[in-house]
Structures are given as structure tokens and as C-alpha cells.
């Protein structure tokens, strides 16, 4: 006859089995994701950095997430957010007009070039920088703030000790291997993007404006967005530079799930290498599987 003591012991073991199984399953899933990212990186011939934050429980998926990568145009999010922060204490700031001269134009100016010998508001510059990756718009935002170091100072005010902006467009895109200028890590950028878009780093009106700009991005259809179900809502900012550097940072709203924050950075050993947005799409598909 089974004694009460033995019965209690068996019930205790049986009760813990689902937990043990769950832990083992999660561990196996995590290993599988890491292995898939490693295989993707190996097949690409480059270096891949990924950081995903699941805001439902703040769990993370990380791959080379503490290594530095050139940000390229993903740094535009920080510059635009810094201007939005200023507008919290000056409700008319975003309507301030900035002169656009022909001499201001650099290598990519799809919006600013239409306003040469005219003006754009800071709000229009923010939209141009984030939704069209307009480099002149980025430079105007940086100039308004007082230089690249002021963008870095804004990051520090948010508790981001990793982000650093040293140059303006287009030189911030040189992405030279080992060069710390204009770099961050995937994890640092993911944490800051979360704070800016889903947290308290900006007041509600400014936060909503940043999210609206990101959701309206026109340059990301082949990057993170391409690896996600079409029904998911995405706000992102892409970036690219020398050494085939190909980046995308995103806030993602899956169906029936809390938002995800995903940073994908990729770079290659050859200066003239082609961009690889397909690598970012593949990484996004790997890390969001199951959500």
C-alpha cells in the first residue's frame, strides 16, 4: 500500500515535471535560435549582431549583442528624438524653419533637394530623416542640436553609455572595421529604442510622434519587415554604409502580443561589399518565430 509520505513525494515530483520540461524546452529553443543565427552569419561571410527584447516579460534574444557596430543611418533616430525632447519645453519648436541651401546637399537628399533656396520645419526634417533617410535632413537636425556630441549627450541623458556619434552625413557611414566612431551595440540600441518608443524617455506627444515617423518609414520593406508576417505592425529605421554594412532597428507589434524591439546590425570584411538586407530579414524571421 502506498504510504501518504510516498504519495506526497510522487505528487511533488509530478508537479515539477512540467516546469522542468518547460525549462528544458526553452533552453533547447534558445540553443536552436543561437545555432540558426550562427549558421546565417557563417553563410553570409560577415559579422551579425542581433538584440531582441520581448516587452511582455523583458526576455531577450542576443547574438553578438555587446559588440560594437557602425550605426549608419539608424543613428537618425537618436537625433530626431533629441529634437523631440527639446520640443517638450518649447511647443513651437517643431515649426521652426531651417534654410536649405544647395551647398547643404550631400550624397542622398530625396526630400531636402526639393526645398533648395527654401526652408523646412524641424518637424519636416525629422520626417525626412526617419522616413526617407535624407542625409541633409539629418545634418540639419545635428546642426540644430549643436553637433554630433550633443546627440551623444542626449543618449547619455537616457542612460545609454554606449552610443556615440562623432561625425555628420555622409562620413559617419565609413564603418571601418574596429573604428569606434559612430557606433553602438545591438543591446544598447535596443534598450534605448524601447525607452524612446515604449517607455518614459519622451513625453506622450513626442513619443507618439516618433512612433508615427517610424511606422511611416519607406526604406525598410526588404529588411526586418520582410522577415515578419504582413499582418504585424512595424516601425523601423534602416541604415547602410561601407563594408556592406546593412542595419535595421525596429519596434514590432505582433498580433495579440506585447511589442517586440529588434535591432539587426550586419557588416562585412570588404569595403565595397554589397548591402545584404536579406540577412536582416532572415535574422528577424529566426528570432521572432513563435510569437
Curated annotation (Swiss-Prot):
Residues 1-28 form the signal peptide. The active site is at residue 73. One of its GO terms (cellular component) is extracellular region. Its main location: secreted. It catalyses: a beta-lactam + H2O = a substituted beta-amino acid. GO terms for biological process: beta-lactam antibiotic catabolic process; response to antibiotic. A beta-lactam binds at residues 76, 133, 169, 240. It comes from the Bacteria. The class A beta-lactamase family has a specific amino-acid numbering system, sometimes called Ambler or ABL numbering and often misspelt as Amber. A multiple sequence alignment was used to derive a consensus sequence and then the consensus was numbered taking into account insertions and deletions. This allows use of identical numbers, e.g. for active site residues, despite differences in protein length. UniProt always uses natural numbering of residues, hence there appear to be differences in numbering between this entry and some papers. This is Beta-lactamase CTX-M-2. The lineage of its organism: Bacteria, Pseudomonadati, Pseudomonadota, Gammaproteobacteria, Enterobacterales.
Amino acid at each position: 500500500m502506498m504510504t501518504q509520505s510516498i504519495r506526497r513525494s510522487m505528487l511533488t515530483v509530478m508537479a515539477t515535471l512540467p516546469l522542468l520540461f518547460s525549462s528544458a524546452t526553452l533552453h533547447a529553443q534558445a540553443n536552436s535560435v543561437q545555432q540558426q543565427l550562427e549558421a546565417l552569419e557563417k553563410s553570409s561571410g560577415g559579422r551579425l549582431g542581433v538584440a531582441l527584447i520581448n516587452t511582455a516579460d523583458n526576455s531577450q534574444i542576443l547574438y553578438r549583442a555587446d559588440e560594437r557596430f557602425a550605426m549608419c543611418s539608424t543613428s537618425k533616430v537618436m537625433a530626431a528624438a533629441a529634437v523631440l525632447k527639446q520640443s517638450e519645453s518649447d511647443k513651437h519648436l517643431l515649426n521652426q524653419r531651417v534654410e536649405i541651401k544647395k551647398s547643404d546637399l550631400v550624397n542622398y537628399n530625396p526630400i531636402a533637394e526639393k526645398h533648395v533656396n527654401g526652408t523646412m520645419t524641424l518637424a519636416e526634417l525629422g520626417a525626412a530623416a526617419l522616413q526617407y533617410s535624407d542625409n541633409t535632413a539629418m545634418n540639419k537636425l545635428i546642426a540644430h542640436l549643436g553637433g554630433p556630441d550633443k546627440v551623444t549627450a542626449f543618449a547619455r541623458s537616457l542612460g545609454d553609455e554606449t552610443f556615440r556619434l562623432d561625425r555628420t552625413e555622409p562620413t559617419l557611414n565609413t564603418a571601418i572595421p574596429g573604428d569606434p566612431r559612430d557606433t553602438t551595440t545591438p543591446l544598447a540600441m535596443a534598450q534605448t529604442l524601447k525607452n524612446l518608443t515604449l517607455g518614459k524617455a519622451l513625453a506622450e506627444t513626442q513619443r507618439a510622434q516618433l512612433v508615427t515617423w517610424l511606422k511611416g518609414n519607406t526604406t525598410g520593406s526588404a529588411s526586418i519587415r520582410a522577415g515578419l508576417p504582413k499582418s504585424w505592425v512595424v516601425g523601423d529605421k534602416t541604415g547602410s554604409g561601407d563594408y556592406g554594412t546593412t542595419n535595421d532597428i525596429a519596434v514590432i507589434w505582433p498580433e495579440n502580443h506585447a511589442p517586440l524591439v529588434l535591432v539587426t546590425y550586419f557588416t562585412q570584411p570588404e569595403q565595397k561589399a554589397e548591402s545584404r538586407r536579406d540577412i536582416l530579414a532572415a535574422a528577424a524571421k529566426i528570432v521572432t518565430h513563435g510569437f
